[in-house]
Amino acid sequence: MLLFRATLLPSPPFFHKTYFSHLSPVIFSDDPLPVSLQRNRVSGCRKQKWRQIRTLALQSDTLSEVRSAPPELNVERNKFRILIAGGGIGGLVLALAAKKKGFDALVFEKDMSAIRGEGQYRGPIQIQSNALAALEAIDSQVAEEVMGTGCITGDRINGLVDGVSGTWYIKFDTFTPAAERGLPVTRVISRMSLQQILARAVGDDAILSDSKIVDFVDYGNKVAVILENGQQYEGDLLVGADGIWSKVREILFGYSEPSYSGYTCYTGIADFVPPDIDTVGYRVFLGHKQYFVSSDVGAGKMQWYAFHNEPPSGSDVPNGKKEILLKIFNGWCDNVIDLINATEEELILRRDIYDRIPIFTWGKGRVTLLGDSVHAMQPNMGQGGCMAIEDSYQLAHELEKARKESIQSRKPMDVKSALKRYEKERRLRVAVIYGMARMAAIMASTYRPYLGVGLGPLSFLTKYKIPHPGRTSGRLVIKYAMPLMLSWVLGGNSSKLEGRSLTCRLSDKASDQLRKWFEDDDALERALGGEWYLFPLNNGDIQPIRLVRDDKRFHIIGSISHDDSEGISIHLPFPQVHKTHARIACKDNIFYLTDLQSQYGTWITDNEGRRYQAPPNVPVRFRSSYSIEFGSDKKVVFKVKVLSTSHKSAVYGGQNLSPVV
């Protein structure tokens, strides 16, 4: 059998795969090598055999290196080397942190596309204030590039809304906790862009592509990894940052299945700009056994995630994901439906959601775990990647501390104690945030706006629109608990970060109206951008009507033209419409409808499904997503919609959306 072994030095060029030609093959017997080399799996005699093989390999390599290797390869390695399984965010940030501390790092990544193109599959990632601060403490220049590339969402309104009505349930203030503690404001960045930035900072010479770790041996003073192709690399520490299906974790503690959350997730990116893009960063739309998340990711794009309760390993018919989603979220608010409609079918992806309950012990000997390999979380808190970044900072910090102690005491570096301190510092915080993510998933998917929702035979109660007691009490609890929770999640780790000044960027400054938007829904609605339209629901002969947002002008609706009046005439030649039926006017960015004592009346259905008649000569406010009926037989019905100027045609198939003037 052929065994390839390379002794790699700190000199950067020799991490690169193009130098594999210097590796010397050593021919042994035809007996296969052990599949697993960890101590708890290999019998005594197989261990002895492996040590003999390794001794022969070392002797042969030494002769080979003397004869054929460049002079640099004969220099003794004197830097502490960290072997990192996995080139995801956690692995790359750890490699960067190690590099900044003066350690060697070598990242093993089985598929370079996981670094260069993972974002195409998994979409943008939210990097919250706590992770950005940790990244600043690791490398301020890299953090600056990440923040400059990302899209700020923490300077706007974020929170929970009712999935059907689209009304706010609770708003999150992620700006104040960051500003008060001198932390960067939360961003969203393309996962691919983030990993490219990190990979450049780490250097291609420290990333070994096409390399999959299948086994390792901890010798007490060193650790060696064995790749799928038989190559072996030696270091002082092995860190498993290889994700929820971690091979390093499996070898350490045995195979175990991750926990299925009960939800599958559809995700997509749309060229779509909502009309409230300047005031809202992200929303979580709540429903029963399903929920929907949307977020601005910059560059005129929106990222969304649709969670639905169903068994794992499901599948969809070819090109059928959008159709399935429209059925699942049928009857939900326009914010959800419009975003699904605006997404191309081929950009919709599906994956099941799993997590791993954090374990008490993260490693053994000179091997430890980091990120999803030890505490994979559900995505509801947006903290999965953030925790991996915090892990990376803490691990590098503890290793640097151990090195300083070693120099002072003139004793070998106590790696095992450093790893124990790393676990101790991270264990509680990770467990609490993991629990919060699970609770958020439960709350988002068990939300019931009204009595009768999810009650089977008693579902008829929903038509009475009686608020569910859990909805009311839940809002009260969240209102007072959320500020404390966000303060701890976003700022609770900042006191442990060394070498970082407590500063806020001018570019992170929020609108002066932010506090008012949190407290006043009307003020938030008045700040809504875009254009207002009446879209016909059951008559294809009528074009959408754009309403003029001008306090000095108004619309007159009637079955005859009113071009000679002061108002803007909207001509609806139908028997249900009176000659002078109604007037629509705008005041302070709010629209009102007044029925002008029409013969058949004017009816309004709000976004919670309540239908009522507009009283004659009394201005009645209407909002986006309301329906307006001229006449009582539901034949002349319009849906009120607000669309961003640049993206309205993408959702409505290029219909003529010219104003009526």
From Swiss-Prot:
TM regions (residue ranges): none
Major enzyme class: oxidoreductase
Chief location category: plastid
Tissues expressing this chain: Expressed in flower buds, lips and leaves. Detected in roots.
InterPro entries: FAD-bd, FAD/NAD-bd_sf, FHA_dom, SMAD_FHA_dom_sf, Zeaxanthin_epoxidase
Pathway: Plant hormone biosynthesis; abscisate biosynthesis
GO MF entries: FAD binding; zeaxanthin epoxidase activity
Entry protein name: Zeaxanthin epoxidase, chloroplastic
Source species of the chain: Oncidium hybrid cultivar
